[in-house]
Amino acid sequence: AGDRWPHLALRGAQYLDPAGQARLLRLLRWREAQARSSNRPRSWILDNELATALARTPPADPQALQDLLDSTPKAPRSLGRALWDALQAPLADEDAMPLARAEDLDKKRLRAELRD
């Protein structure tokens, strides 16, 4: 069923405000579902960089999103409407979402280094 909080694994998430992290979580969960249903790698659906950029600065409307997708290499142009819907629709468990913080990622990296 995938990771419940996939945004915590993304380095860029720590630089987003809580609303941005919620948008990123929506996009990553949508991407996971799309990848599973189409049997494609997640990065083919929506790469981490574009997901983070959309979460940081969400487009004003569906046309602005489509224009951005049309001008971005490897963007999911044909999925613009579904991507817009995913970006806009709050998740039922967003209120329980832990926030990505720089110190958490640093602790995780330190633990990994100590194990090696």
Regions found by a protein language model. Give the residues of each.
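Accessory DNA-binding and partner-docking regions appended to nucleic-acid-acting proteins
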Residues: 1-116
